Amino acid sequence: FMYLSTGAWNVTPTLRRFLHRNGYPKGTFLLTDWGPTPDRWFRSGSQHKVNTLKRLATEFPHIRWILIGDDGQRDPEIYNGFAVRYPHNVEAILIRNLTFGESVLSSGRVWGDNRARDITKGDLWLEGNDGTALYEQLKDRGLV
Protein backbone atom coordinates (compact mmCIF):
# COMPACT_ATOMS: atom_id res chain seq x y z
CA PHE A 1 0.00 0.00 0.00
CA MET A 2 1.00 3.58 -0.65
CA TYR A 3 -0.73 6.42 1.11
CA LEU A 4 -0.67 9.53 -1.07
CA SER A 5 -1.85 12.60 0.79
CA THR A 6 -1.56 16.35 0.74
CA GLY A 7 -0.74 16.09 4.43
CA ALA A 8 2.65 17.28 5.63
CA TRP A 9 5.44 14.93 6.67
CA ASN A 10 5.26 16.09 10.28
CA VAL A 11 1.91 14.28 10.71
CA THR A 12 3.42 10.89 9.81
CA PRO A 13 3.54 9.49 13.39
CA THR A 14 -0.08 10.46 14.03
CA LEU A 15 -1.20 9.12 10.67
CA ARG A 16 0.68 5.86 11.21
CA ARG A 17 -0.99 5.37 14.63
CA PHE A 18 -4.43 6.13 13.20
CA LEU A 19 -4.03 3.62 10.38
CA HIS A 20 -2.70 0.94 12.74
CA ARG A 21 -5.50 1.42 15.29
CA ASN A 22 -8.14 1.22 12.58
CA GLY A 23 -6.81 -1.91 10.88
CA TYR A 24 -5.33 -0.40 7.74
CA PRO A 25 -2.39 -2.23 6.15
CA LYS A 26 1.15 -0.98 6.58
CA GLY A 27 2.40 1.09 3.71
CA THR A 28 4.60 3.83 2.38
CA PHE A 29 3.62 7.45 2.97
CA LEU A 30 3.86 9.89 0.08
CA LEU A 31 3.26 13.18 1.83
CA THR A 32 4.26 16.74 1.05
CA ASP A 33 6.48 19.40 2.54
CA TRP A 34 4.77 22.18 4.41
CA GLY A 35 5.53 25.82 3.83
CA PRO A 36 6.03 28.39 1.14
CA THR A 37 7.49 27.84 -2.29
CA PRO A 38 9.43 30.42 -4.32
CA ASP A 39 6.20 31.70 -5.88
CA ARG A 40 3.45 31.10 -3.32
CA TRP A 41 2.72 30.99 0.40
CA PHE A 42 1.33 27.45 0.36
CA ARG A 43 2.21 24.42 -1.72
CA SER A 44 -0.34 22.96 -4.10
CA GLY A 45 -1.67 19.71 -2.68
CA SER A 46 -3.28 18.91 -6.02
CA GLN A 47 0.00 19.32 -7.88
CA HIS A 48 1.72 17.09 -5.31
CA LYS A 49 -0.77 14.31 -6.06
CA VAL A 50 -0.56 14.77 -9.84
CA ASN A 51 3.26 14.73 -9.80
CA THR A 52 3.47 11.74 -7.46
CA LEU A 53 0.99 9.67 -9.47
CA LYS A 54 2.92 10.44 -12.66
CA ARG A 55 6.15 9.35 -10.96
CA LEU A 56 4.53 6.11 -9.75
CA ALA A 57 3.26 5.32 -13.26
CA THR A 58 6.74 5.92 -14.66
CA GLU A 59 8.64 4.00 -11.99
CA PHE A 60 6.14 1.12 -11.72
CA PRO A 61 4.60 0.79 -15.20
CA HIS A 62 3.45 -2.79 -14.57
CA ILE A 63 1.32 -1.96 -11.51
CA ARG A 64 -2.41 -1.29 -11.72
CA TRP A 65 -3.44 1.00 -8.88
CA ILE A 66 -6.66 1.23 -6.91
CA LEU A 67 -6.98 4.96 -6.25
CA ILE A 68 -8.99 5.83 -3.14
CA GLY A 69 -10.10 9.32 -2.23
CA ASP A 70 -13.09 11.48 -1.44
CA ASP A 71 -15.02 14.23 -3.13
CA GLY A 72 -14.02 16.92 -0.62
CA GLN A 73 -11.14 18.43 -2.56
CA ARG A 74 -9.71 17.45 -5.95
CA ASP A 75 -9.38 13.65 -5.82
CA PRO A 76 -12.09 12.96 -8.44
CA GLU A 77 -10.45 15.31 -10.94
CA ILE A 78 -6.91 14.15 -10.21
CA TYR A 79 -7.72 10.44 -10.35
CA ASN A 80 -9.83 10.82 -13.48
CA GLY A 81 -7.00 12.72 -15.20
CA PHE A 82 -4.54 10.01 -14.18
CA ALA A 83 -6.86 7.28 -15.54
CA VAL A 84 -7.17 9.12 -18.86
CA ARG A 85 -3.38 9.55 -19.20
CA TYR A 86 -2.39 6.16 -17.77
CA PRO A 87 -5.35 3.80 -18.31
CA HIS A 88 -3.12 0.72 -18.06
CA ASN A 89 -2.13 1.78 -14.51
CA VAL A 90 -5.62 2.06 -13.01
CA GLU A 91 -7.59 -0.92 -11.70
CA ALA A 92 -10.31 1.14 -10.03
CA ILE A 93 -11.11 4.60 -8.67
CA LEU A 94 -12.96 4.69 -5.35
CA ILE A 95 -14.49 7.96 -4.22
CA ARG A 96 -16.18 8.35 -0.85
CA ASN A 97 -18.94 10.94 -0.95
CA LEU A 98 -18.55 13.29 1.97
CA THR A 99 -21.50 14.59 3.92
CA PHE A 100 -22.23 18.30 3.72
CA GLY A 101 -20.46 18.92 7.04
CA GLU A 102 -17.42 16.82 6.11
CA SER A 103 -17.12 18.64 2.81
CA VAL A 104 -17.19 22.06 4.45
CA LEU A 105 -14.58 20.97 7.02
CA SER A 106 -12.42 19.40 4.31
CA SER A 107 -12.23 22.32 1.95
CA GLY A 108 -14.47 25.09 3.19
CA ARG A 109 -16.84 24.58 0.29
CA VAL A 110 -19.30 22.11 -1.12
CA TRP A 111 -18.82 21.21 -4.74
CA GLY A 112 -19.59 17.51 -5.10
CA ASP A 113 -22.15 17.53 -7.88
CA ASN A 114 -20.86 20.62 -9.69
CA ARG A 115 -17.37 19.43 -10.49
CA ALA A 116 -18.06 15.70 -10.47
CA ARG A 117 -20.70 16.30 -13.14
CA ASP A 118 -17.94 17.24 -15.60
CA ILE A 119 -16.05 13.97 -15.10
CA THR A 120 -16.75 11.07 -17.41
CA LYS A 121 -17.14 8.18 -15.01
CA GLY A 122 -16.29 4.89 -16.66
CA ASP A 123 -16.26 1.29 -15.51
CA LEU A 124 -13.33 1.97 -13.19
CA TRP A 125 -15.31 4.46 -11.09
CA LEU A 126 -16.86 3.37 -7.78
CA GLU A 127 -18.62 5.74 -5.37
CA GLY A 128 -20.06 5.24 -1.92
CA ASN A 129 -20.98 7.04 1.27
CA ASP A 130 -18.59 5.02 3.43
CA GLY A 131 -15.79 2.50 3.33
CA THR A 132 -18.15 -0.43 3.72
CA ALA A 133 -20.07 0.51 0.57
CA LEU A 134 -16.82 0.88 -1.38
CA TYR A 135 -15.48 -2.43 -0.03
CA GLU A 136 -18.66 -4.24 -1.11
CA GLN A 137 -18.25 -2.86 -4.64
CA LEU A 138 -14.63 -4.03 -4.70
CA LYS A 139 -15.78 -7.49 -3.60
CA ASP A 140 -18.46 -7.54 -6.30
CA ARG A 141 -15.77 -6.88 -8.90
CA GLY A 142 -13.44 -9.52 -7.46
CA LEU A 143 -10.78 -6.99 -6.49
CA VAL A 144 -10.61 -8.11 -2.83
Predicted stretch roles:
Residues G7-V144:
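C-terminal cap/substrate-recognition subdomain and adjoining C-terminal extension
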